[in-house]
C-alpha cells in the first residue's frame, strides 16, 4: 500500500501577486493558517485580551472563522479574523494588520452589536475584494 507523504505548509510572501480570501477560503485551507503561525493560534494572541470576552481565551483562528453566531459579534469574529489573515499575507489588502486590529478592537469594545455588524460588513467587503486601499 502507498503511504501518503505529509507536506509542510509554506508561508506566503506578501510581495507575491494580490491575494485575498473570504472566510470560506481560510476555513478550507487550514494549512495556510498553520504556515503563518506554526500552531492553532488563540485569537487573544492576535487581537489582545479583549478578544476573549464573547468566546473565551481558548478560541483559535479556525474556530473564530467557523463560529456560527448570527449576531454582529459572530460576524465580526469571522470577518475580522479573515481580514487579519488577508492583511498578513497580502501587502495590497485594503487594511494593514494594525488597522484590522484597531478596527476589530474598537467594534468589540463598543459593546454595540450594531457597530460590530457594521465593521464585519466592511471587513467582508474587503475580504471579497470589494474595497480599494486608499493611499
What are the residue ranges of the model-derived segments?
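Acidic-enriched, low-complexity/disordered segments with a strong bias for Aspartate over Glutamate
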Residues: 13-15, 58, 71, 102, ...
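Alpha-helical bundle/repeat cores within regulatory domains of eukaryotic proteins
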Residues: 93-135
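Short, structural beta-strand-to-alpha-helix junction motif
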Residues: 60-62
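Plant P/S/T-rich low-complexity glycomodules
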Residues: 1-58, 123, 129-135
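Sec/Tat-exported extracytoplasmic proteins
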Residues: 85-89, 108
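Mature extracytoplasmic domains of secretory-pathway proteins
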Residues: 64-77, 87
Amino acid at each position: 500500500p502507498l503511504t501518503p507523504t505529509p507536506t509542510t505548509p509554506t508561508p506566503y510572501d506578501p510581495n507575491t501577486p494580490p491575494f485575498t480570501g473570504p472566510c470560506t477560503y481560510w476555513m478550507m485551507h487550514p494549512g495556510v493558517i498553520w504556515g503563518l503561525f506554526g500552531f492553532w493560534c488563540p485569537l487573544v494572541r492576535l487581537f489582545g485580551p479583549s478578544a476573549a470576552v464573547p468566546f473565551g481565551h481558548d478560541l483559535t483562528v479556525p474556530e473564530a472563522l467557523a463560529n456560527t453566531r448570527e449576531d454582529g459579534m459572530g460576524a465580526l469574529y469571522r470577518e475580522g479574523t479573515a481580514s487579519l489573515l488577508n492583511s498578513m499575507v497580502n501587502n495590497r489588502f485594503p487594511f494593514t494588520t494594525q488597522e484590522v486590529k484597531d478596527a476589530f478592537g474598537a467594534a468589540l469594545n463598543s459593546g454595540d452589536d450594531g457597530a460590530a455588524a457594521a465593521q464585519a460588513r466592511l471587513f467582508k467587503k474587503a475580504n471579497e475584494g470589494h474595497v480599494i486601499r486608499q493611499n
